[in-house]
A protein has these predicted regions:
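Secondary-structure boundary/capping signal
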Residues: 51, 71, 196, 219-220
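A generic local secondary-structure boundary/capping motif
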Residues: 164-166
Length: 237
C-alpha cells in the first residue's frame, strides 16, 4: 500500500531526468580552476616551497615539522600525523596555511565531483542527467540516490550554491523546494516532553546551533556552518 504505488512514480522520475544548465557548469569549472591555481600559489608562498597539496604525508611535513604547528594526541595516527579536516580546523586559527588547504580541498571536490562529473553524465539524447532512486536501501525508509547521487548536491558556501543553480526547470516551469523544519527533533521534543528541547523550539531557536555551542564552544564562531553541520549529525545520532 505504501511502497508499490511509489514504484511507478520513481520510474517516471528516473526516465524524465533532471535538466542541467551545461553552460553554467562549464563556466563554474573554469572559475574553480582559476581559484584553485590562485590558492595553490598562495599555499606555496605560505609554506615557503612547492609540494603536493593532495599528499597528506607532504602536508604533514610542512605543517608539523617545517612550521612547527602543535600536534595533539588526536593528530597522531599509525603512519604519521593526520591532516584530516578536523585537524586542519583546529590549526586554522594558528596559521593561515591550514585554512587555505581546507578551502583548496573544498573547491577541488566541487570541481571533480560536481562540475566536471555532472557534465560527463548528461545523456546526449535527452540533455538530462538520469539518476537511480533507491527505494529500499536506507534503514529509515528514506529514498537514496545513486549514479549520480543527486540527493547530495552541495548547499554550503558560495560555489556550492552556484552548483545547485545549474539544476533548472523546463521553460515556463519552476522548481519548488519544500522541507519540514527539523521535523524529527520537533517530534522528539513533543513525545519526550524534554523541557529544554521544547523551550528551544517554542522560542524558534536553531536546535543544531544550540547543540554546536554546547559541544564545540568557541569553535562555533570560527566555523559556524561546519560546526552546525557536525551538530546536526550528533543530534540525529
Amino acid at each position: 500500500e505504501i511502497e508499490r504505488p511509489l514504484i511507478e512514480v520513481l520510474a517516471a522520475m528516473e526516465l524524465w531526468g533532471v535538466k542541467l544548465d551545461l553552460d553554467l557548469l562549464k563556466s563554474l569549472s573554469v572559475e574553480l580552476d582559476r581559484r584553485l591555481k590562485k590558492l595553490e600559489k598562495q599555499i606555496y608562498e605560505m609554506a615557503g616551497q612547492e609540494f603536493n597539496i593532495n599528499s597528506p604525508t607532504q602536508l604533514s611535513q610542512i605543517l608539523f615539522y617545517k612550521l612547527n604547528l602543535p600536534a595533539s594526541k588526536k593528530t597522531r595516527i599509525n603512519k604519521g600525523l593526520s591532516t584530516a579536516t578536523d585537524i586542519l580546523e583546529e590549526l586554522a586559527p594558528l596559521n593561515p596555511l591550514a585554512g587555505a588547504v581546507l578551502e583548496y580541498r573544498q573547491l577541488a571536490k566541487l570541481k571533480s565531483t560536481y562540475t566536471d562529473s555532472l557534465i560527463k553524465l548528461v545523456n546526449p539524447e535527452t540533455g538530462r542527467v538520469h539518476t537511480s532512486y533507491n527505494q529500499t536501501i536506507t534503514a529509515t525508509g528514506r529514498l537514496s540516490s545513486s549514479d549520480p547521487n543527486l540527493q547530495n548536491i552541495p548547499i554550503r558556501g558560495e560555489m556550492g550554491k552556484k552548483v545547485r543553480q545549474a539544476f533548472i526547470p523546463e521553460k515556463g516551469h519552476e522548481l519548488l523546494s519544500a522541507d519540514y523544519s527539523q521535523i524529527e527533533l520537533r517530534l522528539l521534543a513533543h513525545l519526550s516532553g524534554d523541557p529544554l528541547l521544547r523551550q528551544i523550539f517554542l522560542e524558534d531557536r536553531d536546535i543544531h546551533m544550540e547543540t554546536a555551542r554546547r559541544v564545540f564552544g568557541e569553535a562555533v564562531e570560527l566555523f559556524p556552518e561546519e560546526m552546525r553541520r557536525r551538530a546536526k549529525i550528533i543530534n540525529f545520532s
